[in-house]
Each structure stands twice: as structure tokens, then as C-alpha cells.
């Protein structure tokens, strides 16, 4: 909490009354104009504590009417009632008078935004614009002059827009232009002087006149009226970011104008503000959107320009304001977020703006403002102004001026004594051990306080006063002068600070010891005492601790430099030590003076620093190492992420327990969280809200380090954390909070005045326990914190207090140890809780079971969070209902537990009904869809309301209910009307029959067809012996058995048949028996038995009565589910009547497969695939053995073969397991694709060979794939002899068709290889074939060689050819014509035509039937004949078909061999 110290200005000796006050915008100088009855008018300048600035007194015999400081320089413009304007230069103590064009009161003085020009205006409407130099002297004549003829009231300069070049440059910088960015950064660039920033003088402004008009003066000096109001203008504002002008008149008429760049104004809003008129109003604008008005009323009135909303803030008596106290003036400080207002009773009221945090919506309206403690002054406050960069507040009353400066409230807690400052010179002292409280009044403005059980010390930086308790009062035990900023006490010693040393003094100020600090260590400025240890921190971020247990203080921890322990350290903010002196906690500020979000805890014994990072929720340890090695760092999480994002502001160690540490942390301002926190996933619903202030306690141990013990939000009625001593936390209370009685149930205890305490979580109910119990509970808390529940249990097992066991049970909720919780509930005697916990064991989620424990212990918030965590929204719904949180229950049901939504609505409706809220109950009964019976019940005592509701709802069920009620009241006519609305035709018919109007009842039954109505009417007709009508309405009612009964009784046989067919099988059988017994119309009996599914009886009766048509119909409906004997009998019947297809179907249904197959053979019936499938017995069938099944399948396949259905035969042979027969059937089909596929999947040698043989019968010469398959199948079938024969045939094709002897030789080579590998039954025959192949290969090779050597040795080539011609078996291998053709071609090329002719003649003799042109080109033959002069031969040529060359057989073979080797 902050206090405001008031410093009354030291005015001149001459009595005077202040008239104007104004702060310099940046420097802490306040200008005050006052009126003196004797001397006239005065202007003085004061410092922040009210001291007058020397040589600044200005005095005239007339009054000052206007004051205005220069925006940056220490130049004050002063306007006087004579029209004189003085420029006072505070720096040089110079006065410069502006020339005198004004002749009356100066009404306005306003500096331009750059401070180079000044506008002055008087009450005659004369307006001047002056240019001044840096010392405040006027430069030449006025830049402009206007005479408006009416008194000027306000002047506001319009901020100049940035030049076009600057706008473009800004856009480029945002886009990432490095040059543009450098031009904006003056540290990196010298381009700044060249920026064309447009007209930066800002010499355009608005002025208002007494007649209510507003004029705009542009840069060129031209003036134009832009707005006009109906009365004098009281306030004028210009909102830069919206380019808008706000005008408020004396009649409180608010007008908002949008201003164009040219200065034209368009009115966009006009509204009449609330408040009394006829008196002066003080109006301020907050952040360009919120208008605040003080009009001498007890309230401040707010108007939100953006939302169009208004609200008020009132003064509250609990803060010390008087009833009827009114507010005269108001002012807002943006830096502090404080709204200050002065009252007619001399009080300064302040409202602090509540910050908006990023975890949700901020406060709105009057909830944005929190009223603070007022500052008490004197007189009627008329003016109030914030100013300077120090944010000082000047307050002017009718008699004096005071300057308020903020100072933090001092408070201290030590040895069960708490001292809290509540005003600048008043301290509230509470002796908590005895309950005594004292108000300590001093004659100084207190800047600090320190309390012990023996004395209380206060000081102000210049003087120290010691007070000790004496009976019911505090008496002064010593006062001495000492310029110390901080102070500490221990027993009878006082510790004060001076540069580079600590002074140990007596209560009277006598120095008895000096504790020195070196120049490098700095001067001590922070002190703390805990137990018998004192810790001191210096302004150079060093710290040292002392042991005070002896007569003189001894160093306990040598001086440490934080800069060596913590990187980027700024300065110390505060530091504390624990009761053992082995832990020192430190708060720091960063280098830029912003608060650090970490707490540093130095371990004296281990020489390590633990770092608590409250922003990220991490704890790290920095360990210093010897020999100047860099420190080591370790980090881990010390608290839940939901507790992250805070900044510590207070920290304390327990006064007696060295392990306990507590701190107070504020939520970081919006936008302050680092990225690491922002990346955390969103917290589960219900836990997303973050408290503004948290109290966190920790346990410290050597083995486990620092562990979070507890955390809770600081109660709203408390101001700040004051300290800690087991079993309580201590807080300062907010001023104005009324003292309240102790609330034992919530665990809060309030001490009168300013101190409050709250027990530690584990000590609720044990606040007055003895030391042994306290130690046991501390150990319990410690072990629970480290997670050792067994040790925690041992530490309290001997304690008999139920409160202790209840605390243990509460801990079990936190640790989720249900086994320990059972023991705790037993020791508490909590039978209900034990039973509930036992019943909850059936829940699968641990959190759900723990939540039940929390409910039994009254920990409802924890139970709620546990249910949310495990997402057991059904149990959460029940919890909300049981705890009377119905809105939450409904919300959960609607969003997450829709299974129980209607139940929730219903239960809520029952609750509302019990609460007598019938209107809401009715609504929720409707939502639960139970209103049709619950609302009539609920409104049964209010029939008029019920009737209105029923008529309004127009619901058939409700109409029916109301009709039944009316019928019970014998109001038949009205009941009929409502039954008709409800479309309850049964009730209509029933009432009409009751009234004897049976004809009307019959009309209704016929029109509607309602079964119940028809049945009731049929009963009526039957009772009246009107059989036909009864049968008719029984039929309409679908009550066929009753209609059949009447037909049988009354001989209505024709109707009986139709009714039986419409009725159930049982009724059909009864009707059939009726016809059978009667012996007539037996066809009807057979049909009815048939329709009823009684086939055996139908067949028997049909055979007996020779009804063949009926038999045929029955046979058509039989299937495999029918009786086999019945099927066989029907099949015989079909055979007799030559219905063979139906007979086969029946035989198959009866599973007589052989008979069905035999019938097909005998009658030459084609076996379809469907019939074949029906004849095929599954492998799992137990009706037939596997051998019989295969035999049947082969018979089916044989039959299919005879009928030419080869594919079906293949399928059945395959199913029978006879793949060879299946292949033969497939070969007969000629389906090459399926043959190849079947051979590939069968994997049998015989099938491979069969497939290959078949493929050889095809034109494999044109299809390389077929040739490849042939080679593959022969290879897989291990038929190498057949493969050799195929290669031999391939070679012959190459020779005969393509004359490709090279490929032919390759094919022969492959044939030889295959044959040589083959294992034949006749080796002699194999040897003969091999010899033949070898001979062929030799001849082909010789011919190939002869042709190849021709180019090198033609003679040798010709000789080889001639030798070949002499071979006896040449014709069987090589075409002789090819050899002769080769020789002829050679001799023709050599022009040896005679030799060529010779070989032609030999060829003719050797091949008499061949055409020569088949071997020798016809042109070659013609050339030979021409060369010899012979006639050309006949040119008749046989037709010759040329085929494409074959694939390389060797490559194909190698590819096939590879496939075979890879085939498993």
C-alpha cells in the first residue's frame, strides 16, 4: 500500500489566496499564482517538498490570470489581468515582457507542440501567435492576429500529421527494408537530418469563444468556424488517435466532432450528460475515451465515448468520507493509473484503475476503479493537478497549496509484534501475544518502522525515535538525530547505516560498535534480523551476515558479490535471512531497474544459490566452484504451470522455523510473460483463471532442496503479506475494511486495527496447540511436501486430536493417498466418509475416488477440480446438484454430460418447485420433456392456471389429460371437445357409445381407422347381435381372431377365408381345420395349411384330394430348410408330371445329389453353374465322406465334359483334386490365358508339359510371350528332351523363315544343352539325337564362318562353301540355295558371269522345283544372263510370307531359367 505525504508550500509571508497552479510537464517545479489583498498578484515556483525556488518570486499590483509552462524548457508564460504577458526563464532568472497588443485579461496561453510559438488571447477576443527564441524572448511581430469579438475560453493545438516521406519510410521499415530501419535508428544512421517530416511546427489549433463557437486556425493562419453550441463552452479536448474534437458546454451538453485533415468538423454524437447545471464543472479525459466530470456532487460521473455507456463512482464512508461530502475537481495520472479528486471537506480521494490481465476479460465500468485511502488536508479543495515525471500531485484549496508525494506504507512484524503505518505520522502497533493494540502518533513523517517485543523504532531519514511499552501506552525511550535510510533492532541494540559501515547504537543513539564495508563492497542500504542473525545488503549488490548472539556482532557469512553469483545482476531490492542464519533470500531488480521475477536464495554452508523463476515455474541451482571456474547450473520445475507468470514482491522466513519460507507474488502485467509460458497448453476448463496475488510457502532442506508447500490467493480484504511465524501467516489489512468477527469455519482470524492472521494449511484448528504438537505437525507438513506419506503418518500417529487427523485426511486429497485417508477417517470417527470412500472404489479413475474423499471433508473446490481433471462430468453434474449449484450443473450437462441432460433439467425443476418457483420449474419440466405429467400434478391445485397452460401448449397429451379430468367431473361435452383436439378417437367413440350415439361412433371409427376405437365399437355391435357390423369393425381393428370366431359361429364361410388369410398362422390353421372338418371347399383348407407353413399337412391333404395344382404351388415354396422326406415326395410328384427342373431342385434341397445328377443325365438336362454349386458338398459337411464327395464332384465334371461345359468341368475336377483331368478339360476349352494361369498355379510336371505341348500347337512364332511360356513350362516340368526339340524347331524356323543362321546356331546350342541334361528312358536314342544336333551345329557354324571370313579371305570363304556343298546331309540343316546364292553373288560382283551361271545351273539341278529368286536376287540372275547374252529366265515367283524375326532364344532361355530357379 502507498501513502501520500503532504508538503504544504512555504508561501511568502504576505497572506494570499492561490488562484492558479500548474506543473512543468517533466521537471518537478510547480508554479502557483496567488492573490494578495495588500500586494495584488503573485507568482511563485516551488520544489517537490514545497520549498520555494530562490529568486523566482514575481509580484504585480494586479492579478495573474493564466499560467503555462514551456513543453520542455524551464520557461513559464504568465498572463495578467491588464493584458500583460511575461516570459519568465527560471534557468536564467530572467523576465521578458511581450509587447502590449492586449488591453484586458489574458484568457488563454498555450505553447505549440514544439515549443517554438505561443498563443495568447484575451477576453476581448484578440488572439496572437508569437515566435520565441530558446530563452523565451519574442522574435519580431506576431505571426498572426485575429479578432473574434468575443472572449476566448480555450485553445488546443492539433498535433501535426507526419510528412508523406516519413509515412512511406515507416511502411518500408515495417516491410523489412534495412535502409529504412537504419534511417529510423539514430544510433546507426546519419540520414535523420534529411527526413522530410512535413510541417512539424504544429501551428494549427482550435479556439473556443464565450458564445459557444469553436474556430480552427490552420497552418497558413486562416481561421474558420467549425462548430457551434447553444451555451458557453466549459471544456475542449482533442483526441489525436481518433482525429476527434470533444466539446462540453456549461449546460453539460456533450458533442463529438470528427475532424478532417483540412480542419473541417462533422458532428457524429450529441448527448446530454447527467449532473446539476449552473455551477462550474471540472472535466478530464482518460486515455482518449473516458470523460470524467466533477460538478460539486458526492459522485464522479463517467461517460464512455466509445461504448456510449455511463456510470458513477461514489465516496464511501467506511474509508473515512463524510456523508454529503462533494467532489469539486478531478485529475488522472496515466503513469500510475490513479484518478484523484478533491472534496469540499479537504480530502483527496483516489481511485486506482484495476489492471486487465491476459487470462480473461478485464473489469468494466465502475468495477475498473478501486477506491484508496484518502489523504486528509484542510479547506475546500478547488484545484488538483498531476505533473512532472515524478507524478507529483498539487492540491489547491481556498487557503493553501499542498504537494502530495507517494511513499510506500511502512510495516514490520517481529517477535509477535506488528507495526503498520496508516498515515504519514501514525503507526498502529499490535502486540499479538497479549492482544494489545496501540496507536503511535509522532511529530515526523515516518519513512520506516521496526518492531520487537521490547520496543518500536520509527525514523524519517533524519531522526530516530524509540518507543517501549509501558502499561497500556507506548512511551518514548530515546530520540536521536541520525541520517539513516534503514534501521534494525535486536534486544537493546539498534543498527543504523552510514556510507560503507553499520553502526551499532544504544537506544539513546550512542555508537558502541562499527561494522565496516570496503569501498568495493559498497554502503549498506538493506537490513533484516531473524533469530540472532543480521543480514545487510549494499548498494553495490554485495551482502554480509552477522551473528548477534554474543555481546558484539560477529561476521557469520563473509561478504558476497552477487555479480559473481548471478549473471546480469542489477541491484538489491530486499533481502532476508532465516532463523539459523544459513539461508539468505534476495530480491533483485534488473539492470534497467525493472523488477526481477526471480528469488535468489543463498546457502551459506553449501555456497550455492537457488533461483526461483516465478515466470516459468522453474527452480535452478547455481554452484560456485573454486579456481575461477564457471558456475554450474541445474534446473527443475518447482510448481504447477498454473502458478507461473508471477513476480515476487515480498518474502519472509519463519521467525523460529528455519525450514519455512513464504513469499507474495503479483501476476505479471499483460504482455510480460515470456514465450515459454505462452507456449504452454491451455489449462482445463475451470482452472484457466489466474489470481492477481498469490501467497506461496516453501520448505527448505539440505537433502531435498526447496519444495512448494502451499499456495493460495491473497484474500481480497488484505493489503500485503507482513510475515510468518508458525502457526500463522500475518497480513496487513486494507484500510476501510470493517473489523469482523473471527470466522473459525473459514480459518481466518482478524485482529482489530490493521493486522490479520491466517493459520497455515496444516494448522487449521490447531492454532493453540502445544510445542510438541506443533513440531509434529511441522514434520508432518514437511514429509507430505516431499511426498513421503509414510513418514508423515508416523510423525502424527500418536496425536489424538481429530483436527490433526482431519488435516492428514486433507493432505491425502492433495497426495491422493486413499489408503492413508481410510486410517485418518477411522481416527476421526467419520463413518459416513469411510462408507462413501468405500463405495467410490468402484470408480475407475483415481481422481474420482479422491474427489469423493474431498467432498466428505468439505473440500468442495478440490472435488470440483478433480472431477474436471478426470473429465467425469457425470459425477461433476451430481456434485453441482448436491451442492445446490444448479446453473453450473445445467451448464455441465449441456456441454459435457448430455446423457444426463434431461435428468438434470428434471431435478432442477423439482428443486425449483420445492422452492416455490413454479414459473421456472415449469420451463425446466418442459426441457426435461416431463411436463405432460409433472405440470398437471404441480398445478393440480390451481386449475385455472392449468387450463391456461394446457390451452397455450396445444399438446395432445395435455389435452387428453384435461379431457379425462373433465370426464371425471361429468363434463362430457367439454371433454368431447378436448378429446377431439387430442385426436383420442377411442375416447370419443367410447363416450359416444356411452351416450347411445352409436351411429356417430361408427362414423368416427370409419373415418379415422383407429384400431382401439374400432375394437370398442365392434364389441358394442357384438353385444347387440349385429354380427356383420361387428365383423367389419373387428377387421378394421385388426382383431381377426374375433372376426373369425364370429364367422365360424354364424357360417360366414366366404368372409372366413379372407379373414384367415389376413390373420396369424394360428388363425389360418384353425380356419383350415374348420374347412377340413366341414368336408367342403378342401382347396381352401389346403391353401390355408400352405399359407400357415404347415406343408406336410397341406401335401397330405392335397394328395388325398388329388389337388395337383395346389401340389405344384406347394412344391414351388419348398427349399433346403424343408423336411427332406417332404422334398423327396414332392420331387417324385414333379418327375411324374415331367417337371424335371423343379424335381432336380427339390432333390438338391433334400441333399439327394446322386439322384439329381442321374436325373440330369437321363433327361439330358444341362447342368448350370448354379446347379453344380448346389450339388457341391462343402469340405466341412458331415453328410458325406471325403471320398464320396470327390467321386460326386468327378461325376459332375464328367457330365459337364460330355455337355461341352469345359470351364465348369475344370472347376469341378479341381475341387475334386484331379488337376490332370482339370487340365485336359481346360485344354479342350482352348482358353490359352486360363491354361497358362492354371499351369502356373498347379505346379505339376505333367500339367506343365501338357500346357507347353498345347502352346506349341499355337502360332508361337508370332507371339514371343507364348514362346517364353513354352520354354518356362518345359523347364519347370523337367522335360528337357521336349525343350530340346522345341529349340531345334526354333532353329529351323530361323533358317527357313529368316535365314538368320546366327540365331539358329544359338537355338541349336540351347537344344544340345537341354538334351545333354535330359534323363531319357532310351540313352541310345538320346545319343543319336545329340549326334544329329552336333552335326547340325557344325554345318551351321561352318557356313557362318565362311560368310564371316569373306571380307578377309574370299578364296577361303568360297572354298569352304564348295566343301559344304559336298556334305551329304546338308539339305537337312542348311538351305543349299543359300550356299549357291552366296557363290553366285560373289562371282557376279567379280563379273565372272560364266562361273555364276555354272552355279545357277547346279542349283537348278539340285533344287529343280525351287524358284531361283527365292535364294538369289532376280536382278543378280538378270545380270548373269545379260553378261552371257542369254535370254532372261521366267519371273514367276511363288508367294512368300515374311515373318518378324524371333527373339534371341538364348536370352529367353536364360530368363526362363532364372524364373524357374526363383520359383519355390
From Swiss-Prot:
InterPro entries: Beta-prop_IFT140_1st, Beta-prop_IFT140_2nd, TPR-like_helical_dom_sf, TPR_IF140/IFT172/WDR19, TPR_IF140_C, WD40/YVTN_repeat-like_dom_sf, WD40_repeat_dom_sf, WD40_rpt. The keyword Repeat applies. Disruption phenotype: Mice exhibit pronounced postnatal renal cyst formation and renal failure. Significant increases in expression of canonical Wnt pathway genes and mediators of Hedgehog and tissue fibrosis seen in highly cystic, but not precystic kidneys. Disrupted cilia assembly in postnatal day 5 (P5) kidneys. Mice exhibit cone cell degeneration and opsin accumulation in the plasma membrane of the inner segments of photoreceptor cells. It comes from the Eukaryota. GO terms for cellular component: axoneme; centriole; centrosome; ciliary basal body; cilium; cone photoreceptor outer segment; intraciliary transport particle A; mitochondrion. TPR repeats lie at residues 772-808, 863-896, 902-935, 956-989, 1011-1044, 1079-1112, 1124-1157, 1190-1223. Keywords: Cell projection, Cilium, Cilium biogenesis/degradation, Cytoplasm, Cytoskeleton, Disease variant, Phosphoprotein, Repeat, TPR repeat, WD repeat. It is found in: Cytoplasm, Cytoskeleton, Cilium basal body; Cytoplasm, Cytoskeleton, Microtubule organizing center, Centrosome; Cell projection, Cilium. The modification Phosphoserine is found at residue 1445. One of its GO terms (biological process) is intraciliary retrograde transport. WD repeats lie at residues 4-48, 51-90, 93-132, 139-188, 221-259, 266-305, 322-361. It holds the Pfam family Beta-prop_IFT140_1st. Component of the IFT complex A (IFT-A). IFT-A complex is divided into a core subcomplex composed of IFT122:IFT140:WDR19 which is associated with TULP3 and a peripheral subcomplex composed of IFT43:WDR35:TTC21B. Interacts (via C-terminal region) with IFT122 (via C-terminal region). Interacts with TTC25. Interacts with TTC21A. It is linked to Defects in Ift140 are the cause of cauliflower (cauli) phenotype, a mouse model for human asphyxiating thoracic dystrophy (Jeune syndrome). Embryos die at 13.5 dpc and exhibit exencephaly, anophthalmia, severely disorganized ribs with extensive exostoses, vertebral and palatal defects, agenesis/hypoplasia of the craniofacial skeleton, and polydactyly of the hindlimbs. Cilia morphology in limb buds is severely disrupted with a broader and bulbous appearance. PANTHER family: IFT140/172-RELATED, INTRAFLAGELLAR TRANSPORT PROTEIN 140 HOMOLOG. Component of the IFT complex A (IFT-A), a complex required for retrograde ciliary transport and entry into cilia of G protein-coupled receptors (GPCRs). Plays a pivotal role in proper development and function of ciliated cells through its role in ciliogenesis and/or cilium maintenance. Required for the development and maintenance of the outer segments of rod and cone photoreceptor cells. Plays a role in maintenance and the delivery of opsin to the outer segment of photoreceptor cells. This is Intraflagellar transport protein 140 homolog. It comes from Mus musculus. The gene is Ift140.
